[in-house]
């Protein structure tokens, strides 16, 4: 049994982690924590997230020193802000824990990336070298030996799952950069109240045009330039990405289908559509990424959907933990 600590459990992704870890037959929740300054400190997780009432009624404990919580802990999930994860991960690693970080603090092995896109100076370049990028379907072997796993961002997960097999198979003409138009539900912005996310203000709108930090994450791990435009949707959760690409001359729809099938035939959390394209409602609340596509001449449109809090965060983190510790990949997820 893996003793498991969830840090930042009060947020949306944190609550989903609580759900998955609680029902995992090989994990035991030792504590749920929030920052010492959090207004949620001392509250029950089930008071903040009533879907957990009668299932997990543990208190959210304030954490100011990891030594209060790290003894005897095998696994730590960090559902915390980037700067917080940056500071906490090394301490938990030093304490002998395996760390799964849902923030962006260790996703890209380039310290200058964090100054430019995250606004802080990275102090642990050696951990950037050591961290395994947790795109579970593609990086499984690296995960098995890693003690620090950087869980990919929500947008990059869907984008890479859709594009990586096609790029690796050399089917795309990358002189025309893939264009990724992605829309996410409001939960992607977290639980903290903001006027722009309030019911009467939220509207379908692009944001972070040419500046969003997920663009370089996607491009770095794909090894290909992309144009990425995120949009805020007026719905609670889920991500839908419409990706436009150019195929190399002579590449057929059958070849695209074959490459995707070969990539994901034995990957249970990626579902391929033989016909048509996926709808968001079919993945919300589920740990899958659904992918469909259409071809017209040399033009390819791929549609990928996922729940941003699940396959885009908590479910993928648990999927990575299952791979790391040798459990069935879908344990506690489906």
UniProtKB/Swiss-Prot annotation:
Catalyzes the NADPH-dependent reduction of N-acetyl-5-glutamyl phosphate to yield N-acetyl-L-glutamate 5-semialdehyde. The active site is at residue 154. This is N-acetyl-gamma-glutamyl-phosphate reductase. It is found in: Cytoplasm. The gene is argC. CDD domains: AGPR_1_C (cd23934), AGPR_1_N (cd17895). It comes from Escherichia coli (strain K12). Pathway: Amino-acid biosynthesis; L-arginine biosynthesis; N(2)-acetyl-L-ornithine from L-glutamate: step 3/4. Pfam families: Semialdhyde_dh (PF01118), Semialdhyde_dhC_1 (PF22698). One of its GO terms (cellular component) is cytoplasm.
């Amino acid at each position: 049994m893996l003793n498991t600590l969830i840090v930042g459990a009060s947020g949306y992704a944190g609550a989903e982690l609580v759900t998955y870890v609680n029902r995992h037959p090989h994990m035991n929740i030792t504590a749920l924590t929030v920052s010492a300054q959090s207004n949620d400190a001392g509250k029950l997780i089930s008071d903040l997230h009533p879907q957990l009432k009668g299932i997990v009624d543990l208190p959210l404990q304030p954490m100011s020193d990891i030594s209060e919580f790290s003894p005897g802990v095998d696994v730590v999930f960090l559902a915390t802000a980037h700067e917080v994860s940056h500071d906490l991960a090394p301490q938990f690693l030093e304490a002998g824990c395996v760390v799964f970080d849902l923030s962006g603090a260790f996703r890209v092995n380039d310290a200058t990336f964090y100054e430019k896109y995250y606004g802080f100076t990275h102090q642990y370049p050696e951990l950037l070298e050591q961290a395994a990028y947790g795109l579970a379907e593609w990086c499984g072997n690296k995960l098995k030996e890693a003690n620090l796993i950087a869980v990919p961002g929500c947008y990059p997960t869907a984008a890479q799952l859709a594009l990586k097999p096609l790029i690796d198979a050399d089917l795309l003409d990358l002189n025309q950069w893939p264009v990724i138009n992605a829309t996410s539900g409001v939960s992607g912005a977290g639980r903290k109240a903001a006027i722009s996310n309030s019911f009467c203000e939220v509207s379908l709108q692009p944001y972070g045009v040419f500046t969003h930090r997920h663009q370089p994450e996607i491009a770095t791990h794909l090894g290909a330039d992309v144009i990425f435009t995120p949009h805020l949707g007026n719905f609670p959760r889920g991500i839908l990405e419409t990706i436009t690409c150019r195929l190399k001359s002579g590449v057929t729809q059958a070849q695209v289908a074959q490459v995707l099938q070969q990539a994901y035939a034995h990957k249970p959390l990626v579902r391929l559509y033989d016909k048509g394209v996926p709808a968001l409602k079919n993945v919300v609340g589920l740990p899958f990424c659904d992918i469909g596509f259409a071809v017209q001449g040399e033009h390819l449109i791929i549609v990928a959907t996922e729940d941003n809090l699940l396959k885009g965060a908590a479910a993928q983190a648990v999927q990575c933990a299952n791979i790391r510790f040798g459990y069935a990949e879908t344990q506690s997820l489906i």
